[in-house]
Amino acid sequence: MDDICCKDIISDLPEALICHLLSFVPTKEAALTSLLSEKWRYLFAFAPILDFDDSVWMQSPLVYMNEVHRKFMDFVDRVLGLQGNSTLVRFSLNCRNGIDRECIFRWISNVIERGVSDLDLGGNFVSNRSMPSSVFVSKSLVKLRIRTENCTIIDLEDVFLPKLKTLDLSSIWFRDGDTCLLKLISGCQVLEDLTMSDLWWDGYWNRSMSSKTLKRLTVHCSDWDRSPGSISFDTPNLVYFEYFDLVADKYEVVNFDSLVEASIGLRMRHHQRAHASYGDLVVNATNLFMGISNVRILQLFSNALEVLTFCCAPIPVFKKLIHLTVETDKDVGWESLPALLKNCPNLETLVFKGLHHRSTSKCQDTDGCLCKSSKDIRSCLSSSPVKVLKILKFGEVASYFGDEEKQLELVKYFLETMPNLEQMILHYNTRISEGVKSQLDWLVPRVSSSKCSVQLICDNAPTYPFYGGIICDNFITPAPTYPFFGDPLHGMVIPYMGDQPHFI
């Protein structure tokens, strides 16, 4: 029995299977297995997935940082050298300052030449520098992710990524703006998922996106000073669209024939907000909203409500929309919401993120807001088809006394005027007074719909970790610890690795 208990079962597994198992942990941790026995000496280096992250090494005192950087670079060089020309599935590299730039570019070129299919680059090793051109010329890449902590320049010469399906770029500066973007998209002939966040543009005023294969598009721009002159989207097979940017002067081409879900965070510039007036469009974004009017799921962020008010006329009809989420803000009015809700004839679920809004002259108009009017019942509410109304962050105080009472008044008004409501769910993460709860209980019999139920949910209720079915009330998660390259154990790994592979 003792012999069976002590038997090393894992070491008897096929070497290819062991390498596969080692690919599920960071390469630095997998390297520790080289100390187990002669058989394990090089196995970690032949894992099809390599994950190098210098942040888990930086536990040493600052005085030793140069030595740590040197050992990290030596470690990566040794692992890649041991692998030779073997096939690599995924290569992840996350580096900070102190790692030689030429070494990094050499590693990237090495894995691309070996046919890596998934490349993930992060950190600030290319800050204010151009990404090596070899990244954008690969016959094997299927997924490419570049996320840097500071701005990385994309200055493209050639783009040839015939198999790339997923492209994720963050903190990117497009040099030669529109030309660079067009070259990037046209060089990815089967691209399906494109994410571009924290974007900057060099001398760039007009933007154009055209792709017949794209299914998901996420765009977050960071240029707060310049509005684009013209934007076009020709993406007929797009299913998901997430768009945060300054509103453009015009949207010439908008082709979203297959769109199902959209999340819009458009905003006006400060001077546009200051000079906006009812009846005069600041810029014309109507074509964009017409283009997304066939969606089934729509999320509008607070600034987008202002864009609807001052940059869109008329608000289009959203015939297929069944789920609408609206983020609110104390500095943004609700002038556009009545017309929007009237133009959603099949809306089933309405979600408010907060119940904040700025009082405007339109609040007293018949259909100028959603707050309770002293004149008439809001027709956008009395004719609403909505069955489920969710209010997130209910009771959250924005900045003034009495905000909780105003929110309660709105809730009462919704319940009293929306005839098709079947469920109202109020989510709160602050303390709700007993007075509010009792008023809601009192209101339930007075709701417009006899089918409606009201549910109050606390989002910050305490949760406990489970260990073998036992609830641990006082459990404190220990901080994770990582061995750094000053550890004796890792000091043994590099010299023990040697230069010759165990197998090829």
From Swiss-Prot:
It comes from the Eukaryota. LRR repeats lie at residues 69-95, 145-171, 173-198, 286-312, 329-354, 369-396, 403-428. Transmembrane segments: none annotated. The keyword Lipoprotein does not apply. SMART domains: FBD (SM00579). Residues 7-60 form the F-box domain. Keywords: Leucine-rich repeat, Repeat. Residues 382-427 form the FBD domain. InterPro entries: F-box-like_dom_sf, F-box_AtFBL13-like, F-box_dom, FBD, FBL60-like, LRR_dom_sf, LRR_FXL15/At3g58940/PEG3-like. PANTHER family: RNI-LIKE SUPERFAMILY PROTEIN (PTHR31293:SF16). This is Putative F-box/FBD/LRR-repeat protein At3g59240. It comes from Arabidopsis thaliana (Mouse-ear cress).
